[in-house]
Amino acid sequence: MRKTVLIVKSALEQFRIPFYSRLAKAFESDGVDLRVLVPPDALAKHQPLPEESPAGLFVPVGTRRFQFGARRLTYQRIGRSADSADLVIVQQSAAELTNYLLFARRTWKRYRLAFWGHGHNFQESLRSRPGECLKKSLSKRVDYWFAYNHVSADIVRRLPYPAERICVVNNSIDTEGARAQWNSITPQETAETRRSLGIPADHPVVVYCGAFYKAKMLDFLVESVTRARRTQPLHLVVIGDGPGNRILLDFEKQNAEWVHLVGARYGRDKARYFRLANLCLLPGAVGLAIVDAMAYETPLLTTRSRDHGPEIGYLEQGENGWMTDCSIEDYADAIGLLLRDHDTRGRLAQGCRRTATQITLANMVERFRQGVRSALQMPPLGISAEADAAFCEQQ
């Protein structure tokens, strides 16, 4: 008998679409039907979907959002869809009101309920004690866990939670595709990109790639790069956008000769700018952008910020990236050191290449697939296999 697995998401990120599509195809031979339930407006933003996305994979469900000060809550009407599912995977979040309904309904519907998430809120500035306490309590009651990587898995184990019910996903993007795009950029294209930005051929380039908000430490970035440029004729290329863009817009206006904001870029267009870069600067809140840097063989320089996501666990100091204290002086010195030291930078680039071949989308799909198999085979948490089998026979 075929099994049905639901993934419930209150957002649909562009970089996740290839993952869901490949996971659905991998499930075909396992007798598993995958459905990803998302808000209609989130799905509409990505139309038309890529050809590789199977028909019916993404299902729009009614969604309501509530704002209470800085707190945003989401409710998705998925009750009956879950009733016929064998496994429901939801975000580990106290702000997803749907989760509470799913916890209540599984008492008599007996679908397995799994969390997919970080383990806790890694951004200290956004962490609330009541929210984290509630999240911790719920995290110990799901039937299975899909942890972003080993950092998240360690947090979940310490809740405590049974290690045999945790799948370490190794959160990633399509690194193979990103590397293919990066490798396809010709020297002529790179030279033309330099010319279009007014960057001399012998001037080093550092790139920032990510969103613009407080935890990204944009003020810190501006001051550090300004300090580093006193000893290096470097140029800063900024890829991204967000609510904190005023800081960088003003910075570019004052330093138009060497600061270049190019906006949000994707795919091969983004790879084109990384081809210029000697270093990737992300002083605060490192997330999946570290995987971009690895795929593009561009060593990441960051700090010991308390706002990093679990993906910071992919960084190996002195092997594939570099981390300093949260000091503008230390960070600026590290920029200068790594731009001057070609041997160290070359070694870090090799480490990036090695890591990029391990943290791949294909591996993430296979890990998630194996995790779903395990979750479907295990009885619900706290229920014996015999009792679970007896319940299933009655349905």
Label each residue range with its predicted role:
Residues 246-268:
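Nucleotide-activated donor-binding/catalytic signature segment of Leloir-type glycosyltransferases, i.e.
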Residues 303, 317-328, 337-343:
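Conserved acidic donor-binding segment of nucleotide-sugar-dependent glycosyltransferases
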Residues 299-308:
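Short hydrophobic beta-strand element within catalytic cores of glycosyltransferases
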Residues 97, 111-129, 141-144:
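A short, histidine- and acid-enriched strand-loop-helix "catalytic/donor-clamping" loop
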Residues 140-192, 382:
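Donor nucleotide-sugar binding/catalytic pocket of nucleotide-sugar-dependent glycosyltransferases
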